[in-house]
């Protein structure tokens, strides 16, 4: 049971400090300093163990948040990791990368700062690894059933681990040369050092999961052979078709998609031989004036990356207006709030420009040298140009970080013959099943661009569906349905 007076004794939210900006810009390590145990215990003590814990509603995984908060308060760390792992395969990922929709749903947040749920989660799993409590959990016996998982992002990894532990023989296919999907090549090292991913993959290998990187299913292996070789297939390739900006000058050299840029920086951190004679990757911000188009998380990832590469000026454009400093009335508690946020990357520099639309890229000798843009306002649900607001901004590197529109259809999905939704995602039934028998879909490939916590939840739920398809029943947890939606 929680301390009934804890939230009265400790009324303020406390988080670990970020390392000083001048220091962290000199390396690619994670930005946060260590958090002391007493401060963490105080934060866990603030949890009220609500009769109706709305934090559960905010988390699609159904994490047992009040339970492990209280276990941390009482110093029962090993019990805490057992509770945490009961609902989340990878708290080491979510504790670093999830925007924590559980926190704005915290009841304490109605009139105080919410409990620092995400930080408590991260400290539990990091301590568990440090103490050697995270061990492989191979199945007691094998079922003789085989499953192919296509895609090694969080949805694919969660599905693979659950199915392996259920006794199925699981092979994960990844078209890139390393396992991890966007966790490997999309997320910068300063947000999550890849050693955290690698130790999880080591655990999964020890449990019996087979990984096959460098295999592009639909190209190197046909859809027909995949279905013939495996009893079930889980599609978890993500929503990797990026949103384009079809304006004059798009073809100019120096205009790149974020997901063309970020992987190079990650490959450098992996130690790959990708540097030119000047010690720079093929796409670099060193010594350049950079404009990032897109104000979301991917844009912030680009922002932190170009700072570390040595950009001399950075602007980040967002077509939407600047959010309010406090929770907007349109997103009341317990929904995820629309509000102005300053990430670690924003703290490091650059200028954020809101309510602006880019209309053309200007080039010199085939290379981008500037862009033309104007301010916009919202009128009847549409963006309208503000007359007389035109401007031109110098730029010799432009990064498009405007999100993703759905999965890539060419190749595997077309060959399989799966049906799609009106929004372009892979259509699925109530059990994550596609229109093709024995083929299931989890994560962004079926849901559309979403959060890591939804990807893991869908991976777990799809694993339960596959297990039930193969065995007739399943004891695996299924935290979400395909139709589940965030609090709104």
Swiss-Prot record:
Cofactors required: [4Fe-4S] cluster
Any GO BP: L-glutamate biosynthetic process
InterPro entries on file: DPD_II (IPR028261), FAD/NAD-bd_sf (IPR036188), FAD/NAD-binding_dom (IPR023753), Glut_synth_ssu1 (IPR006005), Glutamate_Synthase (IPR051394), Helical_ferredxn (IPR009051)
Keyword Oxidoreductase: yes
One Pfam entry name: Fer4_20
Assigned EC number: 1.4.1.13
Domain 4Fe-4S ferredoxin-type, chain residue ranges per copy: 38-69
GO CC terms of this entry: cytosol; plasma membrane
Pathway entry: Amino-acid biosynthesis; L-glutamate biosynthesis via GLT pathway; L-glutamate from 2-oxoglutarate and L-glutamine (NADP(+) route): step 1/1
Entry's Gene Ontology molecular function annotations: 4 iron, 4 sulfur cluster binding; glutamate synthase (NADPH) activity; metal ion binding; oxidoreductase activity, acting on the CH-NH2 group of donors, NAD or NADP as acceptor
Cofactor note: Binds 1 [4Fe-4S] cluster.
Further facts: Was identified as a high-confidence drug target.
Name of the protein in its database record: Glutamate synthase [NADPH] small chain
Species of the source: Mycobacterium tuberculosis (strain ATCC 25618 / H37Rv)
């Amino acid at each position: 049971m929680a301390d009934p007076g804890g939230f009265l004794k400790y009324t303020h939210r406390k988080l670990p400090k970020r390392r000083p900006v001048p220091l962290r810009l000199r390396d690619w390590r994670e930005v946060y300093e260590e958090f002391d145990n007493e401060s963490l215990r105080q934060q866990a003590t603030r949890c009220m163990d609500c009769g109706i814990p709305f934090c559960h509603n905010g988390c699609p995984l159904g994490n047992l948040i009040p339970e492990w908060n209280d276990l941390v308060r009482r110093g029962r760390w090993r019990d805490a990791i057992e509770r945490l792992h009961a609902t989340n395969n990878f708290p080491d990922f979510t504790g670093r990368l999830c925007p924590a929709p559980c926190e704005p749903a915290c009841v304490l947040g109605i009139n105080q700062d919410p409990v620092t749920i995400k930080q408590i989660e991260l400290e539990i799993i990091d301590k568990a690894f440090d103490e050697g409590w995270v061990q492989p959990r191979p199945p007691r016996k094998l079922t003789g059933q085989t499953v192919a998982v296509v895609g090694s992002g969080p949805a694919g990894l969660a599905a693979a681990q659950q199915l392996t532990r259920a006794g199925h023989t699981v092979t994960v296919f990844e078209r890139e040369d390393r396992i991890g999907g966007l966790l490997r090549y999309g997320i910068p090292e300063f947000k999550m050092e890849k050693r955290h991913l690698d130790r999880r993959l080591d655990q999964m290998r020890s449990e019996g999961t087979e990984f096959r990187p460098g295999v592009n299913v639909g190209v190197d292996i046909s859809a027909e052979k995949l279905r013939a070789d495996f009893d079930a297939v889980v599609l978890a390739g993500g929503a990797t078709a990026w949103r384009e900006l079809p304006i004059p000058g798009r073809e100019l050299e120096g205009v790149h998609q974020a997901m063309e840029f970020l992987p190079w920086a990650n490959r450098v951190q992996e130690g790959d031989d990708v540097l030119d004679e000047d010690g720079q990757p093929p796409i670099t911000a060193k010594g350049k004036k950079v404009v990032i188009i897109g104000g979301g998380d991917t844009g912030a990832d680009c922002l932190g990356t170009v700072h570390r590469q040595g950009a001399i000026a950075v602007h980040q454009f967002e077509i939407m207006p600047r959010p309010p400093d406090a929770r907007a009335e349109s997103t009341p508690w317990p929904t995820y709030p629309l509000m102005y946020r300053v990430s670690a990357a924003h703290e490091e520099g650059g200028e954020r420009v809101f309510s602006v639309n880019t209309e053309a890229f200007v080039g010199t000798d085939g290379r981008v040298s500037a862009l033309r843009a104007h301010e916009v306002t919202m009128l009847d649900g549409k963006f309208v140009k503000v007359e007389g607001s035109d401007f031109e901004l110098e730029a010799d590197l432009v990064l498009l970080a405007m999100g993703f529109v759905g999965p890539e259809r060419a190749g595997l999905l077309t060959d399989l013959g799966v049906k799609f939704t009106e929004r372009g995602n892979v259509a699925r039934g109530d059990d994550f099943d596609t229109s093709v028998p024995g083929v299931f879909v989890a994560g962004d490939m079926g849901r559309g661009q979403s959060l890591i916590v939804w990807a893991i939840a869908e991976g777990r739920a799809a694993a339960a569906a596959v297990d039930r398809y193969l065995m007739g029943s399943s004891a695996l947890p299924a935290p979400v349905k395909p139709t589940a939606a965030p609090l709104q």
